[in-house]
Amino acid sequence: MRLKPLGDRVVVKVIQAEEVTKGGVILPGTAKEKPQQGEVVAVGTGQYIDGKKVELEVKVGDRVIFSKYAGTEVKLDGEEYLLLRESDILAIIE
């Protein structure tokens, strides 16, 4: 991984939505929902709040759900990533 996020930013590898429904219907690209899940592949160093350094809650390897239109899309080595602020992450999937 050549992306090293700064501050409270997180790099997430996007997990693509299913292309076939449970009923066997193949969805065209225009009908698919924008992905909202991914795996954390890199985290920033944290942020300073009131002069104290606060570490990020998420860590590399966590599966997360994030806001639908959050972050900046980045393509690197044929893979699709999102660069998000930690506050754009809604939940960690356990």
From Swiss-Prot:
Cellular compartments per GO CC: cytoplasm
Subcellular location: Cytoplasm
Recorded GO MF terms: ATP binding; metal ion binding; protein folding chaperone; protein-folding chaperone binding; unfolded protein binding
Keywords carried by this UniProt record: Chaperone, Cytoplasm
Domain of life: Bacteria
Primary localization: cytoplasm
InterPro entries: Chaperonin_GroES (IPR020818), Chaperonin_GroES_sf (IPR037124), Chaprnonin_Cpn10_CS (IPR018369), GroES-like_sf (IPR011032)
Claim: Repressor is one of the keywords in the record: no
Coiled-coil spans in chain: none
One of the GO biological process terms: chaperone cofactor-dependent protein refolding
Protein task: Together with the chaperonin GroEL, plays an essential role in assisting protein folding. The GroEL-GroES system forms a nano-cage that allows encapsulation of the non-native substrate proteins and provides a physical environment optimized to promote and accelerate protein folding. GroES binds to the apical surface of the GroEL ring, thereby capping the opening of the GroEL channel.
Subunit annotation: Heptamer of 7 subunits arranged in a ring. Interacts with the chaperonin GroEL.
Family: Belongs to the GroES chaperonin family.
Designated name of the protein: Co-chaperonin GroES
Organism listed in the record: Thermoanaerobacter pseudethanolicus (strain ATCC 33223 / 39E)
Highest classification ranks of the organism: Bacteria, Bacillati, Bacillota, Clostridia, Thermoanaerobacterales
